[in-house]
Amino acid sequence: MPNFIVGARLHDYGKGTPDELFGQVSADGFAAVQLAYKKCVPTVKSYADVTDALVAETVAAEKAHHIQVAVLGTYVELAINDESRLCNVADFKSQLSVCKALGAGCIGTETTAMSKQPAGTTRAQAQELLCRSLAEILPAAEALGVTVGIEPVTYHSMNSAAATRHILDTMRSPNLKVIFDMSNLVSAENVDAQDRIWYDMGALLGDQIVAVHFKGQAFAPDGSLLHTSLEESRTDYAGAFAMLRQLPQPALPVLREEAVPARAASDIAFMKGFF
């Protein structure tokens, strides 16, 4: 069974310096973070603003506050069917060396919502574009020894365990792994079939998971998504962790997304109840 390390998404704590933000999450009892510089450091407007000095400051904050950067969040549209895709690939590649310098567990991204695609774009086309992007990224990641984590989401180009397995099999890179956001694989259509979701994740991708996201969600009568507390969520955490506890990884970060700092203690207790 993995050692589960409880963490938080850093930009849920607002904006500040790495030292300020890492100090806050550490004081609240978290031991790891997902760090997205553009979302939490005011001086970072573009990836070019992630300077060597900022990275060194972040490394110092990691050590001072005993915080692990589990995921370097570099959420760009790698499967978008327009001319911006190549710029997004360049942005992502520029952060690979940052990931290595931070000692981050992985550099992570989702795979583009289908609603953002030009009209007529099929999911198969979007997945092909994702593979083209990864084909440019992964050789550089392998050369640096950096892990790339891709995150399936029900309404994105890579929308299931099977779709994710297809991408991994296509790319055949030891440096391509999976971020498992439990709630992102649950929709109004499959909320009553979560046992199957967790089975598929474990069977197809279990040993490829490098981080877990933990958040609350439910669904309105029309099927639209509602953000909730963890206690009110429709996500079957117990079922998901029954699978996760069987995995061979020595450790897995479990990151609270949509964290509410005032609820940190109760959220951590709730999360650890499934470990």
What are the functions of these language-model segments?
Residues Q34-L35, V69-T74, G105-T112, V148-E151, ...:
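Short beta-strand segments at enzyme active-site cores
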Residues R9-L10, S46-Y47, E83-S84, Q125-A126, ...:
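A generic structural signal for short
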Residues A48-V55, R85-K93, R123-L134, A161-R165, ...:
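Charged helix-capping and loop-helix junction motifs
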Residues M1-A104, A135, S173, K177, ...:
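N-terminal pre-domain/capping segments
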